[in-house]
Every structure is written in structure tokens, then in C-alpha cells.
């Protein structure tokens, strides 16, 4: 974090306030103001959903199109900017399609699309200048605002039990790490007995697999099919793990640093070992995340939170955990800077 803590907090609050205000600015005739499951209409009726959908499509394209894969991995910062540019174009395209389903009037359509693009820009600014991931924060703020309009119908004791168990499950999953022992050339030469570990998070994507799965089901209008929801979570969890922790890149980086995994040969064998490890972790993490996602659904008949679904609860908890982790990292880094 380049800026100080109060500045980033102020920027985050300001951007969230702007995004929420845009939800209530009327834009004319909208055929279906309830089309977005995260807000209730207005200029920003599409919210962050087009950006999320564009990110999903772009990540899939990067994994299957060699030219985009090279652009992301080999072109460095310029490649990332180009990928971001393509994502913006795709966001505009998807926002245009969704806006047309809401209104066929040219002026209203243009306002809705411009609102979606502005929300995307606000999310980017929050990611770079505020606290946490802008997309996740906007999703969380919209859900929290919706929650304030719906009372808790079940007894507080039952609501707290479900909330606590869900929160504990998310925390355990977010903090779970597989530590792989590694040896450096310096250790071998100097006979250093200290053990170094390569930590790999069980759930690399955090709450993003749930957000992506929810967005996909909302787009397909298939909320009632619970097994499809589980399948989407497992798929996106597996996909995110392989994107964030690429076995080939990890193997090459370890080789460049003259670091090896005990009993595993450098190169292809190390890559295969990391690939097997990540695949197992992806399945375990995806299934665990799905089970946690289904936990509040077991109590759906009790209507603990009227108008506040299980997915919403998980997203709020997950985003809160991710944001707190980033804040903690900032304070630790700041303390180290003062020591130096």
C-alpha cells in the first residue's frame, strides 16, 4: 500500500458512497428494475455484474487462447494493461446486452451502460487506491445494504449459530495452508539445519469462486439447481488455484533460485509434483467451500434472514476476511519499514 491508512480508508468509503448513490438515481423507463440480484434499480442497475462476467470470460479465454496466455505471462506490465483493456471492452459488450433486456429506449440504454462502465472504473480505483478488492467490496456493500431492509425472522440464537458456524468454516478454509518443505543450495553447501517451507493456500481464490458461481447462476436463471451451484464453485475454485499458483511457473522460479523439494528432482518432476499437489488441494478446497456454502441453505426453510440468502452471507464473510487479511498485511509491512 503506497498511501497511508487513513487516506485509503477515506477513498474506500467515498467510492462505496458514490456507488450506492448511483443505485437510486433514476434513469427513465426500465422494464425490469429487479433484474439485478444485488440492487434495486437506478443508474447503476447493472452494478458490478457485467465486470464480473467479463472477468470470468477473460480468465477462461486466457487459459485456452495461447496468444492471450503469452500476453499475460511474458509481456509483464504492458501485457496486464492490454488484458485489462480487453476486459473493459468485454464489459461494455456484456453491459450493452444486459441493458437492452431492461430498456429498448436509446437514451435509457446508454445511461445504463455508462453506469456499468462507471462502476467498473470505481472498482478499479478502489483496488489501486483503496482497501481490498474493488469488485468484492462493491458486491459486499450491495448485499449489506439489502440486508438492512430485511429483518431477521428466526430467533436470534438460531441466527447466531448459523452465522458463527459459517464464519468459522470460512475462516478455517481461508487460513488453511499446505506447507511444502524446500531446500536451497546455500543450505546444502553450508549444512544449515533450518527447515524452510513453501506455503500454498488451500483456497487461493478466496471468496471469488462463490461470486463467480453466483453470477453464472444468476445469468442462467438456475438458482434452484443446488448441484449446479456446487459444481460451479468447485470448477472456479480449481480454476483459480491453477491460475494464481501455476505449477510450471512455480517450478521455473524454484529452479532459478536454486531451490529444490526434498526427494523431488528439479524441472519436469517438480512441476508434476506441484501439479498433483495443487489438483488435490483444488478438489479439497472446492468441496469444502461448497459444503460451507450449503450450510446456510440447510436452514433456508426457517427464513433466518428474509431476503438475505446463503450466498450473500458467504460473500460478506469471505470479503470481510480477505479485507482484514490485507489490512493486517499492511500494518505488518508498515512495521517492518519503520524497523529498517
Swiss-Prot record:
Keywords: Chloroplast, Membrane, Plastid, Protein transport, Thylakoid, Translocation, Transmembrane, Transmembrane helix, Transport. The chain crosses the membrane at residues 10-30, 42-62, 106-126, 152-172, 204-224, 225-245, 282-302, 304-324. Pfam families: SecY. InterPro entries: SecY, SecY/SEC61-alpha, SecY_CS, SecY_dom_sf. One of its GO terms (cellular component) is chloroplast thylakoid membrane. The keyword DNA damage does not apply. It is a multi-pass membrane protein. It comes from the Eukaryota. The keyword Thylakoid applies. It is found in: Plastid, Chloroplast thylakoid membrane. Gene3D superfamilies: SecY subunit domain. GO terms for biological process: intracellular protein transmembrane transport; protein targeting. Disulfide bonds: none annotated. Belongs to the SecY/SEC61-alpha family. Component of the plastid Sec protein translocase complex, which is composed of at least SecY and SecE. The central subunit of the protein translocation channel SecYE. Consists of two halves. These two domains form a lateral gate at the front which open onto the bilayer between TMs 2 and 7, and are clamped together by SecE at the back. The channel is closed by both a pore ring composed of hydrophobic SecY resides and a short helix (helix 2A) on the extracellular side of the membrane which forms a plug. This is Protein translocase subunit SecY. It comes from Cyanidioschyzon merolae (strain NIES-3377 / 10D).
